[in-house]
Structure formats: C-alpha cells, structure tokens
Regions:
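Acidic (Asp/Glu) carboxylate-rich active-site/surface patches
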Residues: 1-19, 23-34, 38-231
Length: 231
C-alpha cells in the first residue's frame, strides 16, 4: 500500500472502484468531527451526479438533508463521529491533522464492502509524508484503537470532493451527521449553537459559558481552537 499524489491525466477514476473519505467539523468550534467513507457502485455514479451530488460546502443544509437518504440507498457507506469530549481527550496527544486521519480510519473500518477496491481517495490535507506518518501512527499494532488497514493504494487529491463522486458523497453524509449532532446538542441544552469559528461565535461562547454554568466547554466545543474566551 502506498500514498500517491493524484494526477487526473495519469489515473482515470471514473471506471474504478473507489472508496472516498471526507470529514466535516474541522472549522467549527462547536460540535463534533465527523468522517464518512463511501463506495459507489460503478452503475450508480451517473445517477448520483444527475441528482446534483457535489462538495457539501457548495450546497445548502436543506439540500444535504434531501440528498443524504438517496446517497445511502445507492452506496455502501459508514460514518464515524468524534464527539467534542472524545475529540478533546484525543487532542491532548494528537494534532488536528492527526485527528482527521483518526476519523477517516474510524469510518473506513466500519465500512462493509463486497467488491474489490482499486483505490481509497482522500483530500490532500497535508504533505504526503505527513499523511503517511499519521496513518502509521494509528495503525500501529500497539495503538488502542484497532483500525482496519488500507489494503489499497491511497490517492491524495487537492479538492478531492470536486474530483470524486465518492468523496462528494462522503462530504454530504458527514455533513448530514454533523447537522444531526448539532441539533441534538441544541435540544439537550435549549440553545442554538452557531457554526464556524468567527468573532460572533466567540462572543456567543463567551456569553454562554458565563451564563450557563451547567454546560461544560469540553462537552460542546473543540478546545483546540484558540478562542481566548473569558469565563
């Protein structure tokens, strides 16, 4: 197994069996980190494109909720959710890019496949050497989580969601789960937690933690964000 920088001129993925993996929640102070792994049977690729499947960042949340059930019917898929409390525990020993790989492996490990795969395809979110290092760290036999290994070569692509229907599907399913988890948090605490990590989010968080002593920051947000919030 090797990590290979994707070159569209050398590798045609349209007629290949691909598992695409993508994550959501990296840029959100509140909520979990969610990754999805998706395999699209060759005969369903065009159907998904005709439905309007594309990078989740380019479509509305209502369209996400419309597309997700259709994607699930046409694919093999698995989603892995790192809730804030778990994310914060792991972040004491792992950086943000490492936790992306952790979530990717979690999603891939739960994926049930009945076809031989040609490639795994993910976004090139760091250098090739660094991504390989993250992978080796979490697939080490001594690591507590026994993740399934990538048996196939892994393609690393810039803006993979725009290149691969599998990664686009993964981004939508991950976003759907992220929205679900945020809605659950809203209901549990009777708040409307904002997305992103803007100054408005910082102001919301500052007011929230001053007024709601029953809400522990590590249970609802990613403490790795340098928000400098006074309580």
């Amino acid at each position: 197994m090797k990590f290979i920088e994707f070159n569209q001129e050398l590798i045609n993925i349209d007629n290949k069996n691909i598992v695409g993996i993508d994550e959501v929640g990296v840029g959100d102070y509140f909520g979990p980190l969610v990754a999805s792994a998706v395999f699209v049977p060759l005969e369903n690729k065009n159907t998904l494109k005709e439905l309007g499947v594309t990078d989740s960042k380019k479509i509305t949340d209502s369209k996400i909720k419309f597309l997700a059930p259709k994607i699930k019917k046409l694919t093999k898929h698995s989603t892995y959710c790192l809730k804030p409390s778990t994310f914060n525990s792991l972040s004491r020993f792992n950086n943000g890019n490492e936790l992306k790989m952790f979530a990717h492996l979690g999603a891939f490990s739960n994926l049930k496949l009945d076809k031989i795969i040609d490639f795994v395809l993910i976004d090139k979110y760091s250098t090739t050497n660094s991504i390989e290092k993250y992978y080796k760290k979490f697939t080490n036999t001594e690591f507590f989580a026994k993740f399934k290994h990538f048996d196939n070569n892994v393609l690393l692509a810039n803006k993979a969601e725009s290149i691969s229907i599998e990664v686009a599907c993964a981004s939508i399913l991950a976003r759907e789960r992220f929205l679900y988890e945020m809605e659950k948090m809203n209901q549990k605490f009777n708040e409307i937690f904002p997305f992103g990590a803007s100054n408005q989010v910082k102001e919301f968080a500052s007011n929230l933690f001053k007024q709601r002593t029953d809400i522990e920051p590590q249970e609802v947000c990613k403490l790795t964000f340098k928000m400098n919030i006074e309580k």
